[in-house]
């Protein structure tokens, strides 16, 4: 305020100058789509998104990033990384046993929008799911 930065919390995660990401020489970032899920969702939208073959997908689920069963069936084990996130605005999305079976990553504490940016950056470094998941735990 008034030209002075006020800090109230210190970040415990990697960021800015500690980051492994460098976008200076990139002309474009990978295409990562956000799909917002809701109860009673029909198959048309998730099928359409998967058919576009994005570089990555963020599934914005309910509470703990919970997604409808039909969306899970459509989006599991795709050729691109898929990350579960929550639409609640805060809280953690942690891995559950079904994630490993579906090939999903989790956003940890990141919002869907921040998870999208991190996945875009992560895909400039690797397509390895374990390494991508580690980025979500570090940043």
Can you annotate each of these PLM segments?
Residues 56, 61-139:
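C-terminal non-catalytic interaction/assembly regions of soluble proteins
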Residues 1-65:
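Accessory alpha-helical/coil subdomains and C-terminal extensions
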